[in-house]
């Protein structure tokens, strides 16, 4: 509530072009709250608490200068946190560090080895993915997801020391999402947006050289190249673990019913799909209904297409955001919502040197 109050205190007047996506957001949130109460996903207290979600509309409606200040503070904190964690992780990989104990993720039956500033997930008392950097987060995908988003917002500006740290962290996370989004963004940006042929050729040549240099490396093959191989049985790449047969079967079974449109109760979902399925957009449709899902995703699409200066930049924004929805389909998470808004509205990520230059110009 305090965060939303701060954003509201820096709000600006809504323009005519913003009215459509404001309405879509309010409709999506109304459907989320009303359908949730109707289907038993929330009780009276949950219903009342969920009303605060309407306040998230303050994130894209704040003054641009304030939004940029928040974005830069977040990027600095994220890069410092990840950088400190990465340094500790590298030391542990080379000479070793003492364990500080174990941590339990309540409700998800997940355990972690705790080291200074980072964790490594455990399974059956053994480390899992010890070579993948997850920092202080519950899985490496968090580093890859937020790292790719921040880099995309900055347009991969490696003159900014924070982006260099985030790039290195993303590489060591071995997040397939990070690798794919980074390459697709850079290729689309240089070919379509900037129309720089030489830069595009250099990028493709660099990727090819990277592939030749790492394809026979067991670590890179296991974590990257093997996961890009096509699986004829699942009809997707090996690294696509965003769904499973039980989720697909459930979605197919409810198609055309009221559950498909407005969702179902959490108990029914978890009892029908073992473990609640997986981190996929299909789970959002099954739980909250297709009506809410279309409105919620539609809000971010409208936000980007209404604010991006060119059609090609809007398409690039949509590619990154939709890919993120596919990879990490959280809804109403304030950090993710804010980063989408910052990306859509071209909030400027400036380094300390650039910030000083701006002050000189303004003075």
Where are these regions (language model features)?
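Long extracytoplasmic/lumenal interhelical loops at the membrane interface
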Residues: 219-289
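Membrane helix-loop boundary segments at the extracytoplasmic
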Residues: 32, 36, 44-45, 312-353
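Hydrophobic, aromatic-rich transmembrane alpha-helices
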Residues: 2-13, 147-156, 163, 290-308
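N-terminal hydrophobic segments of proteins, predominantly signal-anchor/transmembrane helices
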Residues: 2-58, 320-323
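Hydrophobic transmembrane alpha-helices and their immediate junctions
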Residues: 186-189, 196-200, 287-325
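Alpha-helical transmembrane segments of multi-pass inner-membrane proteins
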Residues: 75-95, 120-174, 180-191
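Transmembrane alpha-helical segments and their membrane-water interfaces
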Residues: 37-91, 296-302
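A membrane-periplasm/extracellular boundary helix in multi-pass inner-membrane enzymes
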Residues: 87-92, 191-233, 254-256
């Amino acid at each position: 509530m305090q965060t939303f109050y701060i954003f509201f205190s820096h709000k600006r007047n809504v323009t005519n072009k913003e009215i459509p996506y404001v309405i879509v957001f309010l409709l999506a949130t109304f459907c989320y709250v009303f359908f949730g109460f109707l289907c038993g996903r929330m009780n009276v207290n949950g219903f009342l608490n969920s009303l605060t979600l309407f306040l998230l509309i303050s994130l894209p409606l704040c003054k641009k200068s304030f939004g940029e200040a928040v974005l830069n503070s977040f990027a600095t904190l994220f890069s410092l946190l990840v950088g400190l964690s990465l340094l500790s992780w590298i030391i542990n990989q080379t000479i070793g560090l003492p364990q500080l104990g174990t941590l339990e993720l309540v409700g998800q039956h997940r355990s972690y080895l705790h080291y200074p500033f980072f964790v490594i997930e455990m399974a059956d008392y053994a480390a899992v993915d010890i070579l993948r950097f997850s920092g202080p987060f519950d899985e490496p995908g968090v580093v890859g997801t937020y790292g790719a988003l921040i880099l995309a917002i900055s347009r991969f500006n490696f003159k900014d020391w924070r982006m260099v740290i985030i790039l290195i962290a993303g590489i060591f996370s071995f997040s397939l999402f990070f690798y794919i989004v980074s390459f697709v963004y850079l290729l689309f940006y240089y070919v379509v947006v900037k129309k720089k042929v030489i830069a595009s050729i250099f990028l493709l040549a660099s990727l090819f050289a990277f592939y030749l240099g790492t394809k026979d490396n067991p670590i890179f093959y296991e974590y990257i190249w093997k996961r890009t191989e096509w699986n004829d049985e699942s009809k997707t790449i090996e690294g696509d673990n965003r769904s499973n047969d039980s989720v697909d079967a459930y979605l197919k079974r409810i198609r055309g019913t009221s559950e498909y449109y407005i969702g179902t109760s959490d108990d029914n979902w978890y009892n029908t799909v073992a473990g609640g399925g997986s981190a996929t957009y299909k789970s959002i449709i099954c739980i909250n209904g297709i009506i809410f899902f279309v409105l919620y995703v539609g809000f971010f699409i409208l936000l980007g297409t209404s604010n991006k200066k060119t059609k090609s930049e809007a398409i690039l924004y949509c590619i990154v955001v939709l890919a993120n929805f596919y990879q990490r389909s959280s809804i109403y998470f304030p950090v993710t919502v804010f980063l989408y808004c910052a990306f859509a509205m071209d909030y400027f990520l400036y380094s300390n040197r650039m910030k000083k230059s701006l002050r000189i110009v303004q003075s």
